[in-house]
């Protein structure tokens, strides 16, 4: 191997220099460790052989819908809600811990809840809907058939044909009493 070849790739598997590969690597890093800044993320990517400019990294985070959230230590860190977000070191989540996480996030993020038949529409601050939807999904509540999230709006589907209002009331109680 020539001297030039030794410096072309980092140790480990070769990573393609495509946008998709870079996005996948960013998500992997954010799911594995707490990243507080774009410069920290750029260094972690560079350690893996992916050199990016701050502008590219900013655009990548925007395309991934990454958000900054407060972790259990109170630090603001990046998370990608659509990829399961918030994977920081903590005790394994049992049923009560998953529900507690949903309760805490409801208290922090839920602005309003309105029901119609078996549907509930939840409003959150911009960028937070997918994060709250992920917490609701992980809590695996029997009454919820599924969630759909946009930027600041979630739609929950109640398992019962007329269960939307009871579900909305339950989530509003969590938001008021939980955090």
From Swiss-Prot:
Ranges for region Disordered: 1-20
Classification via Gene3D superfamilies: 3.30.1360.40, Winged helix-like DNA-binding domain superfamily/Winged helix DNA-binding domain (1.10.10.10)
Subcellular location field: Cytoplasm
GO molecular function: arginine binding; cis-regulatory region sequence-specific DNA binding; DNA-binding transcription factor activity
Any one GO cellular component localisation term in the record: cytoplasm
GO terms for biological process, alphabetical: L-arginine biosynthetic process; protein complex oligomerization; regulation of arginine biosynthetic process; regulation of arginine metabolic process
Associated pathway: Amino-acid biosynthesis; L-arginine biosynthesis [regulation]
Disruption phenotype: Deletion alters the expression of 1544 genes.
Top-level taxon of origin: Bacteria
Keyword entries, A-Z: Amino-acid biosynthesis, Arginine biosynthesis, Cytoplasm, DNA-binding, Repressor, Transcription, Transcription regulation
Pfam families attached to this UniProt entry: Arg_repressor, Arg_repressor_C
Protein family according to the UniProt entry: Belongs to the ArgR family.
Function description: Transcriptional regulator that regulates arginine biosynthesis, by repression. Additionally represses many other genes including those involved in pyrimidine biosynthesis; nitrogen metabolism and nitrate utilization; antibiotic production; osmotic stress protector ectoine; genes related to hydrophobic cover formation and sporulation; glycan cell wall biosynthesis; gas vesicle formation and genes involved in secretion as well as genes for membrane proteins. Has a weak activating function on some genes.
Protein name: Arginine repressor
Species per Swiss-Prot/TrEMBL record: Streptomyces coelicolor (strain ATCC BAA-471 / A3(2) / M145)
């Amino acid at each position: 191997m020539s001297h030039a070849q030794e410096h072309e790739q980092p140790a480990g598997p070769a990573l393609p220099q495509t946008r998709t590969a870079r996005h996948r690597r960013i998500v992997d890093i954010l799911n594995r460790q707490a990243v507080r800044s774009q410069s920290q993320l750029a260094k972690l990517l560079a350690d893996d052989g992916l050199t990016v400019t701050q502008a590219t990294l900013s655009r990548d985070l925007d395309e991934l819908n990454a958000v900054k959230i407060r972790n259990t230590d109170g630090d603001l860190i990046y998370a990608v809600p659509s990829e399961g977000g918030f994977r920081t070191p903590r005790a394994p989540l049992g049923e009560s811990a998953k529900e507690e996480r949903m309760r805490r996030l409801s208290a922090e993020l839920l602005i309003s809840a309105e029901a119609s038949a078996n549907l509930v529409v939840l409003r959150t601050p911009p960028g937070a809907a997918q994060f709250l939807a992920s917490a609701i999904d992980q809590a695996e509540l029997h009454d919820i058939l599924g969630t759909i999230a946009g930027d600041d709006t979630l739609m929950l589907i109640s398992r019962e044909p007329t269960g939307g209002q009871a579900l909305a009331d339950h989530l509003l109680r969590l938001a008021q009493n939980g955090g």
